[in-house]
Amino acid sequence: MQNETRTLQLDPHLHIEAYRFKGIMQKFPNHFHDYYVIGFIEKGQRYLACQDQEYIINPGDLLLFNPRDTHSCEQIDGRTLDYRCINVMPDIMEKAVKEITGSGHLPYFSQHVLFRHELTASLQELHILISEEKQALRKEELFLHLLEELIRHYSDVTFLSSVPEPSDEVKMVCEFLEEHYAENVTLNDLSELTGWSKYHLLRSFTKQKGITPNSYMETIRINQAKKLLEQGVRPIDAAFQTGFSDQSHMTKFFKRQVGLTPKQYMKIFEKELHR
């Protein structure tokens, strides 16, 4: 689409990623990340599904995704999306939480949308400072303030113990897919692994994980491809190593989940490596 902007900035002080999408119409299918996402809508309206909950999100709404939260979103009434977010890896979150609370426990955010929240302004200022590479001290203050408010008021440690554990069979399937994501896995392979019929496996996995086995494996592939691209591996080689049939196949799924093409993503990390 013309006049759309897709950018990713790496912050060398906070060790987090800052994404910005402007004027996009893209639908993001059900997927998950291995990191925390804290974002907000600047313009547009979206339908969001996250962990079996549905929302209509608008400008000013703050979004919170935990690692492995399955979520999807799409535009409403043909409106384009302006969106900013920061991605925080679990180890960075753990260090920040320890500074704030003295505890090394990772937070779990049970509220995925904070409607018209005042913290959105703090996140917006933080994102702009990261993008402009300015005011390191102010930036670090904002980051810790933002996390402190979210952890103290919106994280729920007790919630972790009440989250239903997937069945042993579903755990086996997840582990198998995470080990064999680069292979041509079939539903029959998973059926034999669990002793379940194909239909029962597909239905049970989707119900318990909120995502189909194939979408789960595609997400694992994309996450692995990101790691390879960050190391400077060429997209064509990353596609081969992660089980995609070719580079165009990987590009299609990569852009659907990440919002950038593999080449765009790789170039950002190339720039950081040469600083």
Swiss-Prot record:
Keywords: DNA-binding, Repeat, Transcription, Transcription regulation
CDD domains: cupin_YbfI-like_N
Species in which this protein is naturally found: Bacillus subtilis (strain 168)
Name of the protein: Uncharacterized HTH-type transcriptional regulator YbfI
GO molecular function: cis-regulatory region sequence-specific DNA binding; DNA-binding transcription factor activity
Superkingdom, natural source: Bacteria
Leader sequence residues: none
BP terms from Gene Ontology: regulation of DNA-templated transcription
